[in-house]
A protein has these predicted regions:
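Short glycine/proline- and aromatic-enriched beta-strand/turn motifs that initiate or cap beta-hairpins
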Residues: 19-69, 131-135
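Detector for outer-membrane/organellar transmembrane beta-barrel domains
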Residues: 117-237
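Repeated loop/turn-to-beta-strand initiation elements of outer-membrane beta-barrel proteins
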Residues: 22-24, 48-54, 80-87, 114-126, ...
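Outer-membrane beta-barrel proteins
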Residues: 35, 61-67, 85, 96-101, ...
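Residue-level signature of outer-membrane beta-barrel architecture
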Residues: 44-46, 74-80, 107-115, 159-165, ...
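Outer-membrane beta-barrel "beta-signal"
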Residues: 254, 266, 275-288
Length: 288
């Protein structure tokens, strides 16, 4: 199983170097509109089949999010022989610049439908997420004096197929609830990245309210010639009463040595009424 395909980190235990009991993961993205996004996660194994982590992240750009918006997560994961379960609570403290914040959590279940000796398999996953946001809103075109609190939820289904441990295919779909009393036209700088609710396939933050998302991904294992994977993906995002968006990703994951991996990727993103935007990602894993 390659971690670049699944959004959850619960499969990390299956690829840990021998003797590794904790590791660091730094995920950095940059690109159009001055995007600067960084996420640092510490993982450890406190008990057999159990992984726990601490994450701190921020994003900023040269637009309305021109100050760093911080967030924190505590991923907890159990991995068994036929299924894995992950729960990840998250928090966006109310920011002094955006005056927005959020908290919530995501529950993820992965199960194996078939496992073959030649490394072929079929795995299905289902996840649900919930969030409570607080943000400024417009009322009759004027900024309202009080912030608005609202609730979001999502449901996501993924299927991943491996052929001989060489080719991997993944398809996923997610649907989002309709929040009461707010819309993309009235929300002002909401803080929460929607990637905390479902896999988006985008390297930048997505704070607009989605309606649904569909994604497809493919990856190729380059072993034994090269100790790496190459991958590509596509996402279609439908925003609630707003333009739809298309997102393409492509990259390579390199095993630098027994103690480190490097993932380098490119993302092209376009909303229907906008021009193409380019984003780049560097993800480094260090095992100890």
């Amino acid at each position: 199983m390659i971690r670049l395909l699944l959004a959850a980190a619960i499969t990390a235990m299956s690829v840990l170097p021998a003797g590794a009991v904790w590791w660091l993961e730094n995920d950095y993205s940059f690109g159009s509109n001055g995007l600067n996004r960084n996420s640092l996660t510490f993982f450890t194994i406190p008990a057999r089949n159990l992984t726990a982590g601490l994450n701190a992240a921020f994003y900023k750009d040269s637009g309305v999010y021109d100050h760093k918006t911080f967030s924190f997560r505590v991923p907890m994961m159990y991995s068994g022989p036929r299924y894995s379960v992950s729960f990840k609570p998250f928090l966006y403290p109310v920011d002094g610049d955006t005056r927005s914040g959020a908290y919530g959590g995501k529950l993820f279940l992965l199960t194996s439908m078939s496992e073959e000796p030649d490394e072929s398999y079929l795995r299905l996953s289902v996840s649900g997420a919930w969030a409570r946001q607080k943000a400024r809103v417009l009322a009759a075109g004027v900024l309202a004096p009080a912030k608005k609190s609202f609730t979001q939820s999502s449901a996501e289904l993924q299927a991943e197929k491996s052929f001989y441990g060489q080719f991997y295919f993944l398809a996923s779909a997610a649907a989002f609830s309709k929040p009461d009393g707010v819309s993309n036209a009235t929300l002002v700088t909401p803080a929460m990245d929607q990637a905390d609710l479902a896999y988006m396939g985008v390297f930048r933050q997505i704070t607009a309210l989605p309606d649904w998302i569909m994604t497809a991904q493919i990856a190729r294992n380059m072993k034994p010639e090269y100790d790496s994977y190459i991958y590509a993906g596509y996402s279609k995002i439908s925003y609630r009463r707003a333009d739809k968006a298309n997102s393409f990703t492509g990259g390579i994951k390199l095993n630098l040595n027994e103690k480190s991996n490097l993932d380098m990727a490119y993302n092209a993103y376009k909303e229907d009424s906008s021009s193409w935007k380019s984003y780049y990602k560097l993800l480094l894993q260090l095992f100890f």
